[in-house]
């Protein structure tokens, strides 16, 4: 009996503890005349039936008393963890909001500094990317709360304002800006303010949504009156009384009623779920951007816990302090955030809040009279229109000192702060009602805070600006593109995504530059504009002719080129695993790692739909929604008939009929692997070459987008390497964009993966563009795609694509400035520090290799392919530079030898170069090896008298370039080397030319992919060698001695010296090699 009495006593004490923890919930229980139960009320209990307990519980199982104690401890621990997690989330939000404000302040600083320093303009695109990267974590915050319509609408506004900011910076990058245009300054301030308003609203709503479950999920406790009767409980011990007294502080601190003394009056009704009404608290202010919508009731739910006060217990105090700190930040967020980033806000009780609220009118009037100065001791929390984060919009940051010294748009970390002024910004946040326009920034009078800005004057300026822009060919209006958060169906969104049909622009038109005026616009990237013909159009042609001489001289070693066997170029590359690793790495870098799976992963995701009949059924409505059958009619996306004449010319009448019969199905919309394979021409059994022998350009593209199939890695690489031979990069980008936008709006997992794989191919196409291919049209096309991605909320994809674009623009700018930053040795003004004998042969070989490698790694694969097709060195600048370096080195070697007056000196130098060639062979540098060999074996040097041992040694080295069996010796040596290696590109160019001239581009109207596979195989070794780099130190003494090989004689001068040393009428002994030839 003592055991039962003790157990009943402990159970009663536990219930008292639980009542203390849940006392606020008891007080919320509606009761018309009853009072909340007093703490000292004795709660009777049923005696514990020990026999029943032993019957149903196994031996050693915790008794119900232990379970109750564990429940109390678990509830306390979970409350601490929940509040701690909430505090972490709010601190994280506060930190990310700081980063956005810092990024916007940095962007504004760059804009302000453009007026006084044109070089700062180069940092503008990078600063816009910083804003994008700062906002990206906020929109990826908590997927569980993104189902809210309020948050979805807020996301859409953030995306649209961010897209406008990025578009403005991109247009400035392309077209320049008139820095003295006042309307431009006002416009960009409105764009920045719109982004900041959207982010502020997003953070506020996120706090409300995250804070709702904790304070607004009441668990209805059982009423004390409903508890069964039982024997009187034992008196409490001193320790138990002390514990109960300590819990009193927490029960009072967690009280949610506005008046702590008024506990007898219960509310007439229980509060609605998720809504709390706090009496005598200041009403929440309406968000300026949502005038037409009702204020969110959740604002009060976050402000209400501000009435909690601290008390004395250890564990309850810890819980209360965490919750109090969280709610202090929530109160500052909802009341304007004046102390979000500095200082500690005074802790307010409901009564003190009322008292301070009564003083807010006087303080507001004093703020209006005193230029917005506000002391931290006043209740700035109650002013909805004050936020120090907006101060930088009213400041002139052109004199800010903390500008990072970075080149172009280097995405380096942001500066901590650029300084804040003491004059706060008074007025409502930037407001853009539906179809409205931004107001000019500046302090507003109290009467103007709720007035709607006049739309008619803004529309007049907008129309005039549009006329000006239309006349100049610049697009300045911003459309609102459909978003995934709009209340429209997936099919409607899919049909409107590529072609926006919104008749109005909710954001103001942004003018990146102003035509006319007194001040000239700041130029930025002049390479993207069409060159003006200032002279006679007959003058440019001779320049490529001169460069062709260098290319022909480079390939003189291959005068006896014989046709190799076609099977030589059909072999499967041995570096397939390298391409697989590269593909997987790129997917991880770009964020597509989840798309890389096994061979049959596509079929496992979803059953293949019957696409051909489905497409015929959807054709008529698709045309109404803006998707015609031919993708060429969609915003310039080319169809099958938009290719150049070289494709249409070989087509036979039968091929044309078959092509017309296939036009019923849009091949760019196919997603079934079996359907795709049925439209490809596959190889027959026993044939050499790739599995895919041909197909239309569209179906080859669609097949290349199946990047999640490991068996197609080599095919994708071959397509990306050779697509320029049958379609231009601009046309390919348009087709990929069309395919991506066709499937991206769908929520279906399989179609989402198709769109993701398509975008991955598009990013790779952009990443592998040559600098000469980066035209203004392609840049505008890609920047428009970035704008669409941001509007649709695809910030991660937009970030990846934008980074690639800016990297390409940066490389082109550096290439333009390369000639002006060359060292003195490259300009031919450095003096030679000695002779060739002053340096060791292996040291000279290493420095020759470093110079070759620097130029070799700059060559882009498409340059080599385009030269073999078009013989146009203007499109292959890096290849041209590499070949000129080879020729200059060869003539430099000839000149050094021929300028020696004594035969012994000439012999000594020739032996020196033979030793250098030996070390070059060990370094696998075939380029410099053959450059020196071509010099020593040239006619002006070979005709002179040499020692027999020297001539025989030189002949041994010449066997490497023996032309018999299509240069079998060199091909064998090249296949045996291990990277790093610098090959002789002359043979690669000759092979590509042979394949191009010996195979048709099209067979029966379809792209001959077998030809492209041969070209890919030829370029495979070069691509592999470019991946491995040399690890050697640069020796400036030797580099300066080379002097960029600019000090050499022309071929005519070399012949004159050779004839002077040995006239024609003097015979000499022929070597064994000469007798054979």
Swiss-Prot record:
- What organism does this protein naturally occur in? Homo sapiens
* Ras-GEF domain: residues covered: 840-1064
Phosphoserine modified-residue sites: 281, 293, 314, 335, 360
Stated name of the protein? Rap guanine nucleotide exchange factor 1
Q: What is the lineage of its organism?
A: Eukaryota, Metazoa, Chordata, Craniata, Vertebrata
Q: Which domain of life is it from?
A: Eukaryota
Q: Does the keyword Magnesium apply?
A: no
Point to the regions of Low complexity compositional bias: 213-228
What is the stated purpose of this protein?
Guanine nucleotide-releasing protein that binds to SH3 domain of CRK and GRB2/ASH. Transduces signals from CRK to activate RAS. Involved in cell branching and adhesion mediated by BCAR1-CRK-RAPGEF1 signaling and activation of RAP1. Plays a role in the establishment of basal endothelial barrier function. Plays a role in nerve growth factor (NGF)-induced sustained activation of Rap1 and neurite outgrowth.
> Modified residue Phosphotyrosine is at which positions?
504
GO CC, alphabetical: cytoplasm; cytosol; early endosome; intracellular membrane-bounded organelle; plasma membrane
Motif SH3-binding — list its residue ranges. Answer: 281-292, 451-462, 538-549, 606-617
List compositional bias (Polar residues) regions by residue number: 484-494
Residues making up the signal peptide according to the UniProt record: none
């Amino acid at each position: 009996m003592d055991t039962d009495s003790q157990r009943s006593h402990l159970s009663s004490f536990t219930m008292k503890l639980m009542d203390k923890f849940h006392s606020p919930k008891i007080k919320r229980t509606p009761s018309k005349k009853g009072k909340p139960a007093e703490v000292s009320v004795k709660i009777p209990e049923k005696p514990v039936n020990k026999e029943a307990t032993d019957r149903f519980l196994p031996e050693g199982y915790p008794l119900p008393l232990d379970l109750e104690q564990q429940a109390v401890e678990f509830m306390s621990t979970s409350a601490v963890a929940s509040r701690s997690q909430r505090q972490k989330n709010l601190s994280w939000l506060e930190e990310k909001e700081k980063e956005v404000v810092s990024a916007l302040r940095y962007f504004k600083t760059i804009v302000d500094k453009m007026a006084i320093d044109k070089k700062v303009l180069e940092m503008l695109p990078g600063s816009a990317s910083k804003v994008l990267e700062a906002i990206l974590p906020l929109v990826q915050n908590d997927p569980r709360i993104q189902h809210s319509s309020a948050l979805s609408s807020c996301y859409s506004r953030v995306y649209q304002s961010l897209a406008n900011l990025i578009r403005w910076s991109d247009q400035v990058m392309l077209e320049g800006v008139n820095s003295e245009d006042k309307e431009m300054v006002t416009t960009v301030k409105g764009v920045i303010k719109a982004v900041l308003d959207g982010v502020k609203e997003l953070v506020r709503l996120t706090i409300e949504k995250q804070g709702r479950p904790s304070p607004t999920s009441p668990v209805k406790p059982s009423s004390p009156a409903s508890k069964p009767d039982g024997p009187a409980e034992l008196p409490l011990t001193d320790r138990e009384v002390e514990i109960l007294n300590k819990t009193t502080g927490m029960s009072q601190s967690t009280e949610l009623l506005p008046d702590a003394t008024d506990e007898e009056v219960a509310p007439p009704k229980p509060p609605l779920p998720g809504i709390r009404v706090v009496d005598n608290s200041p009403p929440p202010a309406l968000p300026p951007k949502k005038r037409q919508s009702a204020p969110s009731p959740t604002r009060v739910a976050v402000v209400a816990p501000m009435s909690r006060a601290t008390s004395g217990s250890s564990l309850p105090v810890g819980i209360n302090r965490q919750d109090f700190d969280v709610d202090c930040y929530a109160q500052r967020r909802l009341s304007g955030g004046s102390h979000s980033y500095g200082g500690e806000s005074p802790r307010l009780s409901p009564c003190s809040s009322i008292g301070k609220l009564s003083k807010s009118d006087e303080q507001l009037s004093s703020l209006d009279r005193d230029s917005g100065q506000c002391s931290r001791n006043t209740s700035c929390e109650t002013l909805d229109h004050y936020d120090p984060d907006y101060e930088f919009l009213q400041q002139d940051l052109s004199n800010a000192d903390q500008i990072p010294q970075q080149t172009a748009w280097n995405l380096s970390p942001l500066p901590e702060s650029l300084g804040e002024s003491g004059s706060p910004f008074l007025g409502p946040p930037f407001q853009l009602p539906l179809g409205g326009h931004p107001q000019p920034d500046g302090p507003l009078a109290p009467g103007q805070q709720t007035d709607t800005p006049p739309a008619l004057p803004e529309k007049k300026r907008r129309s005039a600006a549009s006329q000006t822009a239309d006349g100049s060919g610049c697009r300045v209006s911003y459309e609102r593109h459909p978003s995934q958060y709009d209340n429209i169906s997936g099919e409607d969104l899919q049909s409107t995504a590529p072609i926006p049909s919104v008749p109005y622009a909710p954001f103001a038109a942004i003018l990146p530059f102003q035509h006319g005026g007194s001040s000239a616009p700041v130029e930025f990237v002049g390479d993207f504009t069409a060159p003006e013909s200032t002279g006679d159009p007959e003058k440019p042609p001779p320049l490529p002719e001169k460069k062709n001489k260098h290319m022909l001289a480079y390939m003189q070693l291959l005068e006896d080129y014989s046709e190799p066997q076609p099977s030589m170029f059909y072999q499967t590359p041995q570096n397939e695993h390298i391409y697989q690793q590269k593909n997987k790495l790129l997917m991880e870098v770009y964020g597509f790692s989840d798309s890389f799976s096994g061979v049959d992963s596509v079929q496992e995701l979803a059953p293949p739909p019957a696409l051909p009949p489905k497409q015929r059924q959807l054709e008529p409505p698709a045309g109404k929604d803006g998707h015609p059958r031919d993708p060429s009619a969609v915003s310039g996306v080319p169809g099958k008939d938009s290719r150049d004449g070289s494709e249409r010319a070989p087509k036979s009448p039968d091929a044309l009929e078959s092509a017309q019969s296939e036009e019923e199905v849009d091949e760019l919309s196919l997603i079934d692997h079996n359907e795709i394979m049925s439209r490809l021409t596959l190889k027959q059994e026993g044939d050499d070459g790739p599995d895919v022998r041909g197909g239309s350009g569209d179906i080859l593209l669609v097949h290349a987008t199946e990047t999640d199939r490991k068996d197609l890695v080599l095919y994708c690489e071959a397509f990306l390497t050779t697509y320029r031979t049958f379609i231009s990069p601009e046309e390919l980008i348009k087709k990929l964009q069309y395919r991506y936008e066709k499937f991206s709006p769908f929520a279906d997992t399989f179609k989402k993966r198709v769109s993701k794989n398509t975008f991955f191919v598009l990013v790779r196409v952009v990443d592998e563009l040559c600098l000469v291919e980066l035209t203004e049209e392609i840049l505008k096309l890609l920047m428009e795609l970035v704008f669409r991605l941001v509007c649709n909320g695809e910030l991660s994809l937009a970030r990846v694509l934008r980074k690639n674009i800016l990297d390409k623009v940066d490389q082109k700018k550096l290439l333009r400035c390369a000639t002006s930053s060359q060292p003195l040795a490259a300009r031919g003004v450095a003096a030679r520090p000695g002779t060739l004998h002053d340096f060791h042969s292996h040291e000279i070989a290493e420095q020759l290799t470093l110079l070759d490698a620097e130029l070799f790694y700059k060559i882009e694969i498409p340059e080599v392919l385009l030269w073999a097709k078009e013989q146009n060195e203007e499109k292959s600048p890096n290849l041209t530079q590499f070949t000129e370096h080879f020729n200059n080195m060869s003539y430099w070697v000839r000149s050094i030898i021929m300028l020696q007056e004594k035969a012994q000196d000439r012999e000594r130098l020739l032996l020196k170069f033979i030793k250098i060639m030996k070390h070059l062979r060990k370094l696998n540098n075939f380029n410099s090896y053959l450059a020196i060999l071509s010099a020593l074996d040239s006619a002006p040097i070979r005709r002179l008298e040499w020692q027999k041992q020297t001539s025989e040694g030189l002949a041994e080295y010449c066997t490497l370039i023996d032309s018999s069996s299509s240069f079998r010796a060199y091909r064998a040596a090249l296949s045996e080397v291990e990277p790093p290696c610098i090959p002789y590109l002359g043979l690669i160019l000759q092979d590509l030319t042979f394949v191009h001239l010996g195979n048709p581009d099209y067979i029966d109207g379809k792209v001959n992919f077998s030809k492209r596979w041969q070209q890919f195989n030829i370029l495979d070794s070069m691509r592999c060698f470019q991946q491995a780099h040399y690890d050697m130190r640069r020796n400036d003494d030797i580099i300066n001695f080379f002097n960029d090989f600019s000090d050499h004689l022309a071929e005519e001068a070399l012949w004159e010296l050779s004839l002077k040393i040995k006239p024609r009428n003097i015979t000499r002994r022929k070597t064994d090699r000469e007798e054979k030839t």
